[in-house]
Structure formats: structure tokens, C-alpha cells
A protein has these predicted regions:
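A short beta-strand-turn-helix
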Residues: 1-6, 30-31
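Hydrophobic beta-strand anchors of alpha/beta hydrolase catalytic cores
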Residues: 7-8, 114
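Short acidic-hydrophobic, aromatic-tinged amphipathic segments that line or gate anion-handling sites
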Residues: 67-70, 127
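Aromatic-flanked redox-active Cys/Sec active sites in thiol-based oxidoreductases
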Residues: 9-15
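Thiol/disulfide oxidoreductase modules built on the thioredoxin-like
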Residues: 16, 76-139
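Extracellular/periplasmic catalytic domains that process cell-envelope and extracellular macromolecules
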Residues: 1, 35, 107-110
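Non-globular targeting/processing and membrane-anchoring segments
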Residues: 143-164
Length: 164
């Protein structure tokens, strides 16, 4: 992704807070970010039976930004040594085993989680709410004067800071 800022959004189709946050993020993307060189890269939980729930959640929430998931199949195949590492080597051309296990690698033990990356893909913010995300991107792009779609919400801010 060649964007000035990239938002990483980690979510779970069964997460109650994700069901509230996702529509806000989609609105923010459509009404502010899409035309301002800000991309959203969404990583959903899609293991086991969650794969169908993941696809349905994307459809139901009209998620137009990039959506990916690591499935049980993909992770298990990457660890499988019986195929002479052929599949693993092909996969490692684009990713790592650590990134497939993103929950441990990136400390994602509760959802939703929002990270912001700069143009060099360095993390400049993590575990922020949608209102904090909007304020931050507006400020970074010198657009503080724009009306806010999502005013600060202390409950949402506290939820995004949770570790579990």
C-alpha cells in the first residue's frame, strides 16, 4: 500500500465492540480518508467456523477497504513439514510465520484494535478509538478545522485501551 497513512484494523465478527466500531470506520473511510491518501487494512478473525461469519460481517457492514484474514488452513499448512516445506517457502516469500500468528506478534488479545502507520509503515499510534483516529489524521494532514464526524467518546476510548 502506497499511502501517506495506513490504518490497521483488527477485529472479530463476534465482537460486540467491533459491531459498533466497524460502521464508524467505514463512514470515516468513505467521507474523509478515501480521498486523502489514507488506506485501511483490515485483519479479521476467520479461524474455524468464524470464516463464514467473517465474510458475512464484511458484506453486512459494506466494508469497502482491504479485508484479509488468516484461516486455520493457511496457518496449519505453513507449519506442515510433510510437503517438503514447498508451501511454506512459497508463503514466506510474502510473509512470515510470526505475522501469520498476528495475535501474539502484535499483542492483539482483544478487539477491536486500531493502529496507524506512517508512509514508511512505522507504527505511530496504537489502540486508539475512531474519534481519536479522526482527530489524529486531521491534525497530521493539517485539516484540524474540518468538522468531526465522531466526537470523543470516553467509553469507546477506554475500550480501545483494554489489553484483554
Amino acid at each position: 500500500m502506497d499511502a501517506e497513512y495506513t490504518v490497521l484494523y483488527f477485529w472479530d465478527p463476534e465482537c460486540g465492540h467491533c459491531k459498533k466500531t466497524t460502521p464508524k470506520l467505514e463512514t470515516l473511510y468513505q467521507e474523509k480518508f478515501k480521498d486523502r491518501n489514507v488506506e485501511i487494512f483490515s485483519v479479521g478473525k476467520a479461524v474455524g467456523e468464524d470464516f463464514e461469519k467473517w465474510k458475512k460481517f464484511i458484506r453486512d457492514n459494506n466494508m469497502t477497504f482491504i479485508n484479509v484474514a488468516v484461516t486455520d488452513n493457511l496457518y496449519n499448512e505453513a507449519q506442515d513439514n510433510s510437503n517438503g516445506q514447498e508451501k511454506l517457502m512459497k508463503l514466506l516469500q510474502t510473509t512470515t510465520l510470526a505475522s501469520l500468528n498476528y495475535q501474539n506478534t502484535y499483542d492483539i488479545f482483544s478487539t477491536p484494535k486500531v493502529f496507524v502507520l506512517d508512509k514508511d509503515k512505522k507504527i505511530i499510534a496504537k489502540s486508539i478509538s475512531i474519534s481519536q483516529l479522526e482527530e489524529m489524521i486531521d491534525r497530521l494532514q493539517g485539516k484540524e478545522e474540518l468538522p468531526k464526524l465522531f466526537p470523543p467518546d470516553p467509553e469507546e476510548d477506554a475500550q480501545m485501551q483494554k489489553k484483554e
